[in-house]
C-alpha cells in the first residue's frame, strides 16, 4: 500500500465507526461468555445451551448493523479508492493498543467485503494479512496465572488454583478430589520428578465452560519439561461441585477442542493470548480451529483461508473429486495434500431430495447452533473465494460445469467459488467398513449406533442414516457429516408399521400405509443399513433397539421434558469415580 495516512475526515469517521461496531460486538460477545460462570454455578444447563446458540448470530448482526451505518451516513459504496485506503490506514492506527486487533481486522474485512467489489479483496483495501501483532498484548486480569509449589507444596497449590476460580457453589469434598488428582498424576508419570528451581503451574485465568462442565486448563513447567493438564469440574450428586477427572495426555486435551463438539464459553480480554497458551500444549492444533472452538468462528475462517492460501503457494497437487459415493445434494472435492473437503450445493438435486438451496443452507446453520456432542463435524462457510484455476483437475472442472454451473465463475486465472462449505476430511464409514477386519467392523458399527443415540438425545435426527453419510476420525470416532436432511427430534413422528390388511399386500413390495413428510418408521432402517452379514451381526448385538419406535419416542420425550443429557469428551475409565471406586459419581440428571 503506497498511500500515507492523511487528514481525510470521511476516512477517519468511517474508521472510527468500524472500530465502534467491532467494540460493540465484542462487548456483547464477552458479556454472554462471562455469564457462563453464572449458569454453571446455578446448574442452568438450558440457559447455557441457549447462550451458545444465540451467540452464533451476534457477529453477523453487528456486521450488518455497521454496513447499514456506513451506507447511510457516508455513502460508503460510492467512495473513491484513495478514501478506502485511508480508511484502512486510520483503522490500523486505532488498533495500536487494542486488546483484540486480529478480531477487529477480521471485522473490518467482513464489513468491507459487503460493500466493496471482490476485485478490491486485496491487502490495499482489506486485511489479506494481519497488520497488528498479537504478541505480548497485556491484559488485566492476565491471560494466565502462575503458581509455585515450592510455597506450601503441590497439594496446597492445587487447592489454591481451584479456589481462585471462586465458584459460588461449594465443593463436595475438595480434599478427596485433590487426592484423586495426585493419585492420577502419579499413575500417569510413574514417579514424581525432582522439583526444579523454575517449577511452576501456569493456569488460564478463565475456566472453559461447555454443557455441564467447567474445565481448568494449564500446564506444569519443571526444568525443560512441560506437562499439560485439564481438570473437569462438574456438579456432584449432592448438588455440590466435584472434580470429575484430570486429563494429562495432550491428545486427550486436543479432543476437547474437536470441531465436532459445541463451542466453549470463555471470558477473554485478549483471545490471542489464550490461543497462544493453548497452542503451547496442543502444538498440532491449528490456530484457526482454536479460535473457532472459543466461539470466534469468523476469526477461525480468516485464519483457515490464510493457511489455505499459504499451502497452495507451497504445493502443486490438484483439487480432485472426493473419494466415496457421490452425493445427491453436494458436490464434494478435496486437495489430497490438505486435510479438508470442500462442499458445494448442486444446482439440481437428486430426484429423491425434495428441498431447495435455502433449506440446505438453513440445515448447515442449524449444525452451528446445536450441541454437536462430538458427533457432527463443524463446517466453515465461505462466499466468493478465489482459488487458482490451474489447481482444479479437468474431471472436477467438468463436474462443476455439469452439476453446479451457477456456483462458480472463472475470472482470468482464478476460479471463484460463490458459496461453499469446508469440513475436516474423514474416511467415509462405508469405505472403512469395506476394508475393515471383523473386529474393526464391530467397533465401527458400535460407534455408529452410539453416534445416532447421542444425536437423538441431543435433539438431532440425522434423517439419512446411510453409512456413506458418516465418517471415521483418526481416533476411530464415528461422526455424522451430511446435513441436508437433519431435523430436530421434536419435529418427527416415529411410528410402527401397521399390519398389512392381507398377506398379498405385504408380499407386494409396495407400502400399504400412508406416511407424512415427518413420519419415520424405524423398522425400515434394517432394509437399507443391514445388507452385510458382518454389519448386521454387530448392529443387532449393540443396537437392535434402534429398529424400534420405542427408543426414538423415549429420546424425543426426554428432549420435550427439558432433560439435558450428559456427554463426556473423555472415556468413562478416566473418571475418578471409575479409577477410584470409593469416589462418588458426578451427577447424571
Swiss-Prot record:
Descriptive protein name: Isocitrate dehydrogenase kinase/phosphatase
GO biological process: glucose metabolic process; glyoxylate cycle; tricarboxylic acid cycle
Active site location: 378
Residues of the signal peptide: none
Compartments where located: Cytoplasm
Keywords, alphabetical: ATP-binding, Cytoplasm, Glyoxylate bypass, Hydrolase, Kinase, Nucleotide-binding, Protein phosphatase, Serine/threonine-protein kinase, Transferase, Tricarboxylic acid cycle
Entries under HAMAP family matching the protein: AceK (MF_00747)
Catalytic reaction equation(s): L-seryl-[isocitrate dehydrogenase] + ATP = O-phospho-L-seryl-[isocitrate dehydrogenase] + ADP + H(+)
A cellular component annotation (GO) from this entry: cytoplasm
InterPro entries hit by this protein: AceK_kinase, AceK_regulatory, Isocitrate_DH_AceK
Entry keyword Repressor: no
GO molecular function, one term: protein serine/threonine kinase activity
Superkingdom of the organism of origin: Bacteria
Enzyme Commission (EC) number: 2.7.11.5, 3.1.3.-
Function: Bifunctional enzyme which can phosphorylate or dephosphorylate isocitrate dehydrogenase (IDH) on a specific serine residue. This is a regulatory mechanism which enables bacteria to bypass the Krebs cycle via the glyoxylate shunt in response to the source of carbon. When bacteria are grown on glucose, IDH is fully active and unphosphorylated, but when grown on acetate or ethanol, the activity of IDH declines drastically concomitant with its phosphorylation.
Keyword Magnesium: no
Family: Belongs to the AceK family.
Amino acid at each position: 500500500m503506497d498511500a500515507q495516512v492523511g487528514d481525510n475526515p470521511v476516512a477517519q469517521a468511517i474508521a472510527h465507526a468500524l472500530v465502534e461496531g467491532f467494540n460493540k460486538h465484542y462487548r456483547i460477545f464477552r458479556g454472554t461468555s462471562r455469564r457462563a460462570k453464572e449458569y454453571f454455578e446455578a446448574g442452568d444447563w438450558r440457559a447455557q445451551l441457549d447462550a451458545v446458540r444465540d451467540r452464533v448470530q451476534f457477529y453477523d448482526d453487528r456486521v450488518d448493523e455497521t454496513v447499514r451505518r456506513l451506507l447511510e451516513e457516508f455513502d460508503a459504496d460510492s467512495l473513491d479508492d484513495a478514501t478506502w485506503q485511508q480508511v484502512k490506514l486510520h483503522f490500523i492506527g486505532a488498533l495500536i493498543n487494542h486488546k483484540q486487533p486480529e478480531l477487529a481486522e477480521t471485522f473490518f474485512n467482513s464489513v468491507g467485503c459487503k460493500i466493496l467489489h471482490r476485485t478490491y479483496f486485496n491487502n490495499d483495501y482489506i486485511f489479506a494479512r494481519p497488520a497488528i501483532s498479537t504478541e505480548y498484548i497485556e491484559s488485566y486480569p492476565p491471560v494466565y496465572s502462575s503458581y509455585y509449589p515450592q510455597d506450601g507444596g503441590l497439594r496446597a497449590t492445587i487447592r489454591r488454583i481451584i479456589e481462585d476460580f471462586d465458584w459460588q457453589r461449594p465443593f463436595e469434598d475438595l480434599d478427596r478430589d485433590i487426592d484423586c488428582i495426585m493419585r492420577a498424576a502419579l499413575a500417569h508419570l510413574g514417579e514424581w520428578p525432582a522439583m526444579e528451581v523454575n517449577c511452576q503451574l501456569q493456569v488460564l485465568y478463565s475456566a472453559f465452560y461447555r454443557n455441564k462442565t467447567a474445565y481448568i486448563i494449564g500446564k506444569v513447567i519443571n526444568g525443560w519439561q512441560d506437562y499439560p493438564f485439564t481438570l473437569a469440574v462438574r456438579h456432584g450428586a449432592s448438588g455440590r461441585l466435584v472434580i470429575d477427572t484430570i486429563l494429562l495426555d495432550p491428545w486427550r486435551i486436543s479432543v476437547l477442542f474437536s470441531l465436532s463438539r459445541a463451542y466453549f464459553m470463555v471470558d477473554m480480554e485478549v483471545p490471542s493470548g489464550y490461543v497462544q497458551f493453548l497452542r503451547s500444549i496442543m502444538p498440532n492444533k491449528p490456530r484457526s480451529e482454536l479460535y473457532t472452538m472459543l466461539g470466534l468462528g469468523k476469526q477461525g475462517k480468516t485464519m483457515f483461508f490464510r493457511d489455505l492460501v499459504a499451502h497452495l503457494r507451497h504445493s502443486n497437487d490438484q483439487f480432485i473429486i472426493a473419494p466415496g459415493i457421490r452425493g445427491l445434494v453436494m458436490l464434494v472435492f478435496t486437495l489430497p495434500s490438505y486435510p479438508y473437503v470442500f462442499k458445494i450445493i448442486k444446482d439440481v438435486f437428486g430426484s429423491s431430495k425434495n428441498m431447495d438451496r435455502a433449506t440446505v443452507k438453513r440445515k448447515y446453520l442449524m449444525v452451528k447452533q446445536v450441541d454437536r456432542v462430538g458427533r457432527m463435524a463443524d463446517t466453515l462457510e465461505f462466499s466468493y473465494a478465489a482459488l487458482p484455476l490451474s489447481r482444479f483437475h479437468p474431471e472436477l472442472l467438468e463436474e462443476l460445469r455439469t452439476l453446479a454451473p451457477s456456483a462458480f465463475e472463472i475470472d482470468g486465472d482464478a476460479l471463484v467459488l460463490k458459496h461453499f462449505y469446508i469440513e475436516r476430511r474423514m474416511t467415509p464409514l462405508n469405505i472403512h467398513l469395506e476394508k475393515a477386519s471383523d473386529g474393526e467392523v464391530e467397533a465401527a458399527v458400535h460407534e455408529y449406533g452410539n453416534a445416532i443415540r447421542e444425536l437423538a438425545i441431543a435433539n438431532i435426527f440425522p434423517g439419512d442414516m446411510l453409512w456413506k453419510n458418516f465418517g471415521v476420525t483418526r481416533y476411530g470416532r464415528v461422526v455424522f457429516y451430511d446435513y441436508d436432511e437433519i431435523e430436530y427430534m421434536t419435529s418427527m413422528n416415529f411410528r410402527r408399521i401397521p399390519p398389512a390388511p392381507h398377506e398379498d399386500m405385504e408380499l407386494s413390495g409396495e407400502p400399504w400405509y400412508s406416511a407424512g413428510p415427518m413420519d419415520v418408521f424405524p423398522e425400515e432402517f434394517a432394509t437399507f443399513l443391514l445388507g452385510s452379514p458382518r454389519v448386521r451381526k454387530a448392529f443387532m448385538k449393540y443396537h437392535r433397539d434402534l429398529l424400534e419406535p420405542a427408543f426414538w419416542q423415549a429420546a424425543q420425550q426426554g428432549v420435550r421434558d427439558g432433560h439435558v443429557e450428559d456427554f463426556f469428551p473423555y472415556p468413562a475409565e478416566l473418571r475418578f469415580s471409575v479409577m477410584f471406586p470409593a469416589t462418588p459419581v458426578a451427577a447424571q440428571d
